[in-house]
From Swiss-Prot:
InterPro entries assigned: YabA (IPR010377)
Protein name (database record): Replication initiation control protein YabA
Organism, scientific name: Listeria innocua serovar 6a (strain ATCC BAA-680 / CLIP 11262)
Cofactors named for this entry: Zn(2+)
Encoding gene (name): yabA
UniProt keyword terms in alphabetical order: Cytoplasm, DNA replication, DNA replication inhibitor, Metal-binding, Zinc
GO CC entries: nucleoid
Keyword Zinc in annotation: yes
UniProt lineage: Bacteria, Bacillati, Bacillota, Bacilli, Bacillales
Entry similarity comment: Belongs to the YabA family.
Function: Involved in control of chromosome replication initiation. Inhibits the cooperative binding of DnaA to the oriC region, thus negatively regulating initiation of chromosome replication. Inhibits the ability of DnaA-ATP to form a helix on DNA; does not disassemble preformed DnaA-DNA helices. Decreases the residence time of DnaA on the chromosome at its binding sites (oriC, replication forks and promoter-binding sites). Tethers DnaA to the replication machinery via the DNA polymerase beta sliding clamp subunit (dnaN).
Disulfide bonds listed in the record: none
Amino acids binding Zn(2+): H103, C105, C119, C122
Length: 129
């Protein structure tokens, strides 16, 4: 092979490596997005299961006539529904996200934390009460 053919071959390989590097970067970005979505869906699933278990625990009351006719919820059923909603559930979800390695601060929300390093913005948010 002459020198020009070798140079062309090396240049071609360099272009292919550049394209592979670009594809690898795109794959990494897509993987990060899928991990974030998976985490969000897992938290939502857990939340819905908790709500379902709470609704199963509350004994179903017979439907009042007023509620059946007018679609108005009786006051004691309203209270039962309000008790099912957990206070601080959003805070618990943020803590869980942070423990799983994601930012919960408004600066980097949802992005993975590098090497599980602490973020001062996230910590200040989680320490507010």
């Amino acid at each position: 092979m002459d020198k020009k053919a070798i140079f062309d071959s090396v240049s071609n390989m360099e272009e292919q490596i550049g394209e592979l590097y670009q594809q690898l970067g795109d794959l990494k970005t897509n993987l990060g997005e899928m991990l974030e979505e998976n985490n969000r869906l897992n938290l939502e699933n857990e939340h819905l299961r908790r709500r379902l278990s709470l609704t199963d625990e509350v004994a179903p009351e017979p439907v009042a006539e007023e509620e059946a006719v007018h679609g108005v919820m009786a006051p004691n059923r309203k209270e039962a529904m309000q008790q099912m909603i957990e206070l601080g559930e959003g805070y618990d979800n943020l803590v869980q996200l942070y423990k799983e390695g994601f930012h919960v601060c408004n600066v980097h929300f949802g992005s993975p934390r590098g090497n599980d390093e602490d973020c001062l913005f996230c910590l200040s948010l989680l320490n507010k009460k």
